[in-house]
C-alpha cells in the first residue's frame, strides 16, 4: 500500500512516490498556483518581520577594502 497525501492546493489525493511527478501537488497547475501564492505573499512563514536598521543596511568598508576596489 502506498502513502497518499492531499494536494495542498486542491485537496486531490496524490500518491507519494517517485512516479508522482509533481508531488505533493496533483499537477503542474496546482504547483504553479501555490508558487504564485508565495510570490504574492498570500502565504508566508510566521515570524517577526525583519527590517534592516540603517547600521546594517550598508556595511562600512575599511580603507584597505576601498583601496582593493580601486585597483580593479
UniProtKB/Swiss-Prot annotation:
For this protein, the record's SUPFAM superfamilies field holds: Glucocorticoid receptor-like (DNA-binding domain) (SSF57716)
- InterPro entries listed in its UniProt record: DNA_gyrase_inhibitor_YacG (IPR005584), Znf_NHR/GATA (IPR013088)
The set of disulfide-linked cysteines is none
Q: How is the cofactor bound?
A: Binds 1 zinc ion.
Task: Output the Gene3D superfamilies linked to this UniProt entry.
Answer: Erythroid Transcription Factor GATA-1, subunit A (3.30.50.10)
Alphabetical UniProt keywords: Metal-binding, Zinc
Q: Which cofactor does it need?
A: Zn(2+)
> Which positions are annotated as binding Zn(2+)?
7, 10, 26, 30
Entry keyword Transport: no
Q: Name one GO biological process term.
A: regulation of DNA-templated transcription
Question: Does the keyword Metal-binding feature in the UniProt annotation?
Answer: yes
One of the entry's Gene Ontology molecular-function terms is: DNA topoisomerase type II (double strand cut, ATP-hydrolyzing) inhibitor activity
Region annotation Disordered: residue ranges?
A: 44-72
The entry's family comment says: Belongs to the DNA gyrase inhibitor YacG family.
NCBIfam families associated with the record: PRK00418.1
Q: Which HAMAP family match?
A: DNA_gyrase_inhibitor_YacG (MF_00649)
Q: How does it assemble?
A: Interacts with GyrB.
Its biological purpose is as follows: Inhibits all the catalytic activities of DNA gyrase by preventing its interaction with DNA. Acts by binding directly to the C-terminal domain of GyrB, which probably disrupts DNA binding by the gyrase.
Name this polypeptide is given: DNA gyrase inhibitor YacG
Look up and give the organism this protein is from.
Tolumonas auensis (strain DSM 9187 / NBRC 110442 / TA 4)
